[in-house]
């Protein structure tokens, strides 16, 4: 199967065909589920697979997917601090974070599919994972400070 990678002369059918082919190859390129968290096994990986296949068809690298993942997740984190907590802001934040974590799974799947995994890519992935973990707590603290009437001692 020829790699289409969403060139301007590719038809929608060509791109869809490339995505389907990548989905089939991704099923064989999955890492073991042994020891994986349930959320990763049943949410991140299944959502990440079509995202990885689409990124493959578009010609993206795993590191590019990592950056898009970080942008989605960190935008969600920033919105926690910036928006008043409402049902709609919560839905938006949740959607961005789920998309970000699905893309975080997709970058590794894309690397396995293309055989382009690298130490630099792994470092980039771990860097953004650490940044996401650290900033979520800060965002919640800022949200509580801005939107809730709490004694300052509770915020320490």
Predicted region positions:
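Topogenic membrane-insertion module of multi-pass membrane proteins
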Residues: 1-92
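Generic preference for hydrophobic/aromatic residues in regular secondary structure cores
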Residues: 23-27, 103, 145
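Sequence-level detector for tyrosine residue identity
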Residues: 39-42, 101, 147-148
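Short helix-loop-helix connector
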Residues: 55, 115, 144-145
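Residue-level signal for alpha-helical context at structural boundaries
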Residues: 69, 128-129, 145, 149
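Helix-coil boundary and interhelical linker segments in multi-pass alpha-helical membrane proteins
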Residues: 77-92, 138-156
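Acidic (Asp/Glu-rich) catalytic motifs at the cytosolic membrane interface
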Residues: 88-141
């Amino acid at each position: 199967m020829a790699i289409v990678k969403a060139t301007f002369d590719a038809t929608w059918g060509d791109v869809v065909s490339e995505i389907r082919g990548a989905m089939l190859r991704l099923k064989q390129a999955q890492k073991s589920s042994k020891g994986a968290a349930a959320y990763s096994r049943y949410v991140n990986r299944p959502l990440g697979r079509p995202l990885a296949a689409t990124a493959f068809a578009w010609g993206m690298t795993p590191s590019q997917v990592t950056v898009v993942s970080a942008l989605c997740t960190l935008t969600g984190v920033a919105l926690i601090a910036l928006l008043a907590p409402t049902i709609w802001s919560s839905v938006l934040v949740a959607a961005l974070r789920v998309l970000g974590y699905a893309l975080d799974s997709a970058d590794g799947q894309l690397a396995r599919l293309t055989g382009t995994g690298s130490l630099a890519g792994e470092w980039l992935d771990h860097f953004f994972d650490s940044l996401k973990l650290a900033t979520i707590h800060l965002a919640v603290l800022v949200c509580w400070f801005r939107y809730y009437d709490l004694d300052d001692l509770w915020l320490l």
